[in-house]
Regions:
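Glycine- and acidic-residue-biased ligand/ion/polar-headgroup-sensing regions
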Residues: 310, 408, 422-430, 441-445, ...
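Short conserved beta-strand and strand-loop elements enriched in small hydrophobics
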Residues: 128-140, 195-203, 258
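Solvent-exposed adhesion/ligand-recognition segments of exported proteins
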Residues: 4-31, 41-48, 53, 247, ...
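C-terminal subregion of chymotrypsin/trypsin-like serine protease catalytic domains
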Residues: 54-86, 108-126, 218-241, 245-318
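Catalytic-histidine neighborhood of serine endopeptidases
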Residues: 116-117, 121-152, 162-166
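Acidic glycine-/aspartate-rich tracts in secreted/extracellular proteins
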Residues: 23-24, 125-128, 160-165, 203-207, ...
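Chymotrypsin/trypsin-fold serine protease catalytic domain
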Residues: 154-246, 250
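Extracellular, surface-exposed repeat architectures
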Residues: 337, 341-412, 451-541, 608-628, ...
C-alpha cells in the first residue's frame, strides 16, 4: 500500500486531508500499481472533486433511493425483507435476501454511531472540536461530547445525556473468525451466491454522477452504501450489484453493519477511516470495533454502588450506607461518573444532587425508592433495568430534561418542574402535571397516566410529543382531551389498558391528520357545538378498539397512508446575500438531472422534494376496527387503502365509502416534531390520488333523518335506511344481512353490482341504471353444500330500470 501522501488544509471544513503524491505512478520495479490513500475525515471535504463527483451512481437508481435506505423511509423500513426497487431503465433491483437494518443508531450528521446509554463510536481522526463530534444529534436531541478513549483510528465517546432515540448498535462482529467461518456467520444471499454484504450510512459530501452538491453533514442528505467485504484484508467494495455509493469527504467515523446469522440481528463491524484506490478500483477501509476500548471508557465513567436492600443517603460529595461513607468519584478529567446501583433499596437525597454528565443506573429485577423532601436531581439521566421499579419522589431541575432509558419502570410521584425525554420502558405519571412537557422516541417507551391531570391540560397537545417511531400513551382509565396529538408517524399509539373505559376526545378546530394508532378500551370523540367544515379529522394510522366512535357536527376521514420519503432540502436555498451569493440550488438541479428518467417512468414524485405525493404509487394500507361509529350532522369518508370494520349509525349525515373521494397528505409527515422536541407542525394538503386504490367496509349501516350513503368500493354487511338515500356504484357490494329501506331510495348505477343475499324491503324507490347488476340470491346454509335458504325481496314502489345492459 502506498503510504506516501501529503496533508493539505481544507478551508471549507477547517481540517486536513490526505492526498497521495504517487496516485498515478507505477512501480517499475514490481510492475504493480500502487494504491493511494484518501482519509475521508470529518474535517475534510475538498481534495476531492473525485470523491464527491463519483459518489452516488444515479444512472439507474434515483437519488432518493440512497437517501430512503439511509433514513429507513419508503420501502426500507427496519426489518423489511425482500425489498425491491424500480430502476430508471424500467427494470427492478432486488436487495440482498436479508432484513433491512435499523439505522436509528446513526447520528444526524452521520459521523457517529450510538452504542447505548451515553456512548457513541467514531473514527479517532475526527477531531473532538468539530461540530459533528462536539454536538451529536439523534431525533430532536443534542448530545454533547464529554470524553473519549481511542485505539488506532477507533474512538468511543462519552456524551452528557443518555440517548433516548435509539437502543444503539449494541452487538459487534467477531474478528477471530476465519474467512470461511465469517462467510458462514455473516454471509447473505445476493445475486445467486452467499457473500459478506453489509450497509453503511453517512452524511459526507453529497454528490451524484457528474454532479457535486457541495453539502456536508446535512442530516436530510444522509445516504446509504451497500458493500461487499473481503474478510482477509478487511477492505470493503462499495461497487456492489449496481447500487453504488462511494465513500467521500465527511463520511469518516460512520458505522459499517453486517448481518449476524447466529444472533439474527445486525451488528456493527467498525467505523470508516478512509479509502484506498488504484486507477481501476476503490475500497473503503475501517477501524475495527474494539469492545475492550468501549469497556475501558464505560468503566472509567461508572461507580458501582452495592445497596443490597439497604438505605442510603447521598449528597454531591458522599454516599453513606449504614454509616459507611464513600466519596462520589470523578474521572481523571474531573467529570462525573454514573452511579450504578445493585440489589434494590432506598436512596435519600440530603441535598439537591447534580450529577453533571453522570447518571443513575439501576440493575434488573429490583425495587428502589428515591426520596428527598423538596430535593431535586439533575444529571445524564436514569437507566432502569428490566423488571425493576423505581419510585421517584424527588423533583427535577428547571430548564433541564430528564432522560429515561432502560426497560424498567419509573414511578413519578411528585411534579418535576422540568421536561421528560423517554425512549424505553414505562414512565408512570402519578403527580399532577408531572412534567412540563414530554418527548417520546424510538417506539419502545410507554407513558402511563396515574391520574386525570398528569399531563399539561393547558397545552393543545397536552404537553406530549411523539417523534420518529413514537411510543405509547396509556390512558389507564383516565379520559383525555386533545386539540391535536403531536404524532409524526404510526409508531405513536394511544391506548387504554384499564378495565375502566376511557374517552379520547379530539377537538381540532382546523383540518388535522393523526398519523398514529388508537387501541384498547378506548372511546373516541370528535365533536363540535355547530357544524364546521374546518374541523376535519383525518386518520391515516390505525384504529383497533372494541368501543365506539362519536362524530358530531364535523368530518371524519379514514384513509391509507402515503408512504413517507426522504427529502433533499427544507425551504428555499440559503442565501448569504439574497439574490447575489447563494448556495447551489441542488434541488432544482436534481430535478433537471432526473427529468428524462421521470418522463419515461411517469415518476416526477421521485424528485419533487416532497415527503409524500398524491401521484405516488406506494400507499400503506391502514385498518380501522371499532364497535359502532355514531355520526350526527357529519360527513364520513373512507379513501384508498383503508379497511374498515364496524357498525355505523348515521343521522343527517353523508357517508362516502371509497371511490372518488379526497385524500390528504401532510407535507411534514415524519418530520412533524420541531425544535428540541417540544414543537409540532403540519401542512395538510387535499387532493386526488393517481389511483383510487382499494378500500373495503364490513358492517351494518343504519341511516336516519335524511342521511346519504354512497357505496363506491367493496362492501359486505347490511343496510337499514329510514328517510335516507343509498347509491351503489361499487362492483363488489354484498348485502349479507337483510336490507331495509323505509321511505328511502336505493339506486344501483355506473357499473354497480349489488348482491342481496338475505332479501330486501324498499318502501320508497328502487332504481337500476345502465351497466349494473342486482342479483337476488338466497342465503347459503351452514354445513350444507349447495343448499340455500330462500329469502323475500319486497319493493312497494316497484322498479325503475334504465338502460339495456341490466342484469
Amino acid at each position: 500500500m502506498n503510504r506516501i501522501y501529503s496533508l493539505k488544509y481544507c478551508h471549507l471544513t477547517q481540517g486536513l486531508i490526505a492526498v497521495s503524491e504517487l496516485a498515478s505512478r507505477v512501480s517499475s520495479k514490481t510492475g504493480r500499481k500502487l494504491l493511494a490513500i484518501f482519509i475521508v475525515s470529518a474535517l475534510s471535504y475538498g481534495a476531492a472533486e473525485y470523491a464527491c463527483a463519483a459518489q452516488m451512481d444515479t444512472r439507474n437508481f434515483w437519488i432518493r433511493d440512497y437517501l430512503d435506505l439511509a433514513q429507513n423511509k419508503g420501502a426500507f423500513q427496519p426489518g423489511a425483507y425482500g425489498v425491491k426497487t424500480p430502476l430508471k431503465n424500467g427494470g427492478e433491483f432486488s436487495f440482498p435476501e436479508v432484513t433491512i437494518p435499523d439505522f436509528s443508531p446513526v447520528s444526524a450528521k452521520g459521523a457517529t454511531t450510538a452504542i447505548g446509554n451515553a456512548y457513541s463510536v467514531t473514527a479517532s481522526h475526527n477531531g473532538t472540536i468539530h461540530h459533528a463530534i462536539k454536538t451529536q444529534t439523534w431525533g430532536q436531541s443534542d448530545y454533547h461530547y464529554v470524553d473519549r478513549v481511542t485505539k488506532g483510528d477507533f474512538a468511543v465517546q462519552r456524551l452528557d445525556k443518555f440517548v433516548v432515540e435509539t437502543a444503539g448498535a449494541t452487538e459487534h462482529a467477531d474478528f477471530n473468525l476465519s474467512a470461511a467461518e465469517a462467510l458462514e456467520r455473516y454471509g447473505i444471499e445476493f445475486n445467486g451466491k452467499k457473500q459478506i454484504i453489509g450497509f453503511r450510512v453517512g452524511a459526507g459530501a453529497t454528490g451524484v454522477t457528474s454532479y457535486g452538491v457541495g453539502q456536508t453533514y446535512n442530516p436530510l442528505l444522509r445516504s446509504a452504501s451497500m458493500f461487499q467485504l473481503n474478510w482477509n484484508n478487511m477492505y470493503a467494495s462499495n461497487n456492489t450489484g449496481g447500487f453504488y455509493n462511494e465513500v467521500t469527504g465527511g463520511d469518516s467515523g460512520s458505522g459499517f453493519y453486517l448481518y449476524d446469522n447466529q444472533k439474527k440481528k445486525w451488528v456493527i463491524l467498525g467505523t470508516l477511516t478512509g479509502k484506498v484506490f488504484s486507477s481501476k478500483d476503490t475500497w473503503a477501509f475501517f477501524a475495527r470495533y474494539d469492545q475492550n476500548t468501549v469497556d475501558i471508557l464505560k468503566n472509567t465513567f461508572t461507580q458501582e454502588v452495592n445497596l443490597n436492600g439497604q438505605k442510603m443517603t447521598v449528597n454531591n460529595k458522599n454516599i453513606a450506607i449504614n454509616d459507611k461513607i464513600t466519596a462520589i468519584e470523578l474521572t481523571k478529567s474531573n467529570k462525573n461518573k454514573d452511579l450504578k446501583f445493585h440489589g434494590g433499596g432506598s436512596i435519600e437525597l440530603t441535598d439537591n444532587l447534580n450529577s453533571g454528565t453522570g447518571g443513575l443506573i439501576f440493575d434488573e429485577g429490583q425495587h428502589y425508592s428515591v426520596i428527598g423532601k423538596d430535593k431535586a436531581y439533575k444529571g445524564a439521566g436514569v437507566e432502569i433495568g428490566k423488571d425493576t421499579v423505581v419510585d421517584w419522589s424527588v423533583k427535577g431541575e428547571a430548564n433541564d430534561n430528564l432522560h429515561k432509558t432502560g426497560a424498567g419502570t419509573l414511578n413519578v410521584n411528585v411534579a418535576q418542574g422540568n421536561n421528560l425525554k423517554t425512549g424505553d420502558g414505562t414512565v408512570f405519571l402519578n403527580a399532577e402535571k408531572a412534567f412540563n412537557a414530554i418527548y417520546v422516541a424510538s417506539g419502545r417507551g410507554t407513558v402511563k397516566l396515574g391520574q386525570a391531570d398528569a399531563l399539561d391540560k393547558n397545552s393543545d397537545y397536552r404537553g406530549i410529543y411523539f417523534t420518529s417511531r413514537g411510543g405509547t400513551l396509556d390512558l389507564n382509565g383516565f379520559s383525555q382531551s386533545f386539540k391535536k396529538i403531536a404524532a409524526t408517524d404510526v409508531g405513536t399509539i394511544i391506548t387504554n389498558t384499564s378495565d375502566k373505559t376511557a374517552t379520547l376526545s379530539l377537538q381540532n378546530p382546523s383540518r388535522y391528520v393523526y398519523h398514529g394508532s388508537i387501541t384498547g378500551n378506548t372511546n373516541i370523540e370528535h365533536t363540535g357545538t355547530q357544524k364546521s367544515a374546518d374541523s376535519s379529522l383525518i386518520i391515516d394510522g390505525n384504529i383497533n378498539t372494541r368501543n365506539d366512535i362519536t362524530v358530531r357536527n364535523s368530518q371524519l376521514r379514514l384513509q391509507g397512508h402515503a408512504t413517507s420519503h426522504a427529502i433533499f432540502r427544507e425551504g428555499p436555498r440559503h442565501c448569504y446575500v439574497p439574490g447575489v451569493l447563494c448556495d447551489k440550488d441542488y434541488v432544482t438541479d436534481f430535478a433537471r438531472l432526473e427529468s428524462e428518467a421521470n418522463k419515461k417512468n411517469n415518476s416526477a414524485y421521485k424528485t419533487n422534494n416532497q415527503v409524500a405525493s398524491f401521484d405516488q404509487p406506494d400507499w400503506e394500507t391502514r385498518h380501522f376496527r371499532f364497535k359502532t361509529l355514531n355520526l350526527e350532522n357529519s360527513e364520513f369518508t373512507t379513501a384508498r387503502n383503508s379497511v374498515v370494520e364496524g357498525d355505523i349509525v348515521a343521522s343527517n349525515s353523508t357517508l362516502k365509502l371509497g371511490g372518488d373521494v379526497p385524500v390528504f397528505i401532510d407535507m411534514y409527515d415524519g418530520i412533524n416534531i420541531t425544535g428540541n422536541g417540544f414543537g409540532f407542525r403540519q401542512d395538510v394538503r387535499e387532493g386526488r390520488s393517481a389511483d383510487d386504490g382499494s378500500s373495503s367496509y364490513t358492517g351494518k349501516i343504519t341511516l336516519q333523518k335524511g342521511s346519504t350513503l354512497d357505496i363506491n368500493n367493496r362492501f359486505i354487511g347490511g343496510i337499514e335506511a329510514h328517510d335516507s338515500k343509498v347509491n351503489v356504484t361499487s362492483p363488489d357490494a354484498l348485502l349479507q344481512n337483510s336490507g331495509v329501506f323505509v321511505n328511502s331510495t336505493l339506486s344501483v348505477r355506473d357499473g354497480g353490482h349489488l348482491t342481496a343475499q338475505k332479501g330486501s324491503t324498499v318502501t320508497a324507490g328502487f332504481r337500476l341504471e345502465r351497466k349494473v347488476r342486482f342479483p337476488l340470491s338466497g342465503t347459503p346454509e351452514n354445513g350444507a353444500d349447495n343448499t340455500w335458504m330462500p329469502v323475500l325481496t319486497y319493493m312497494t314502489e316497484g322498479y325503475d330500470l334504465t338502460g339495456d345492459t341490466l342484469r
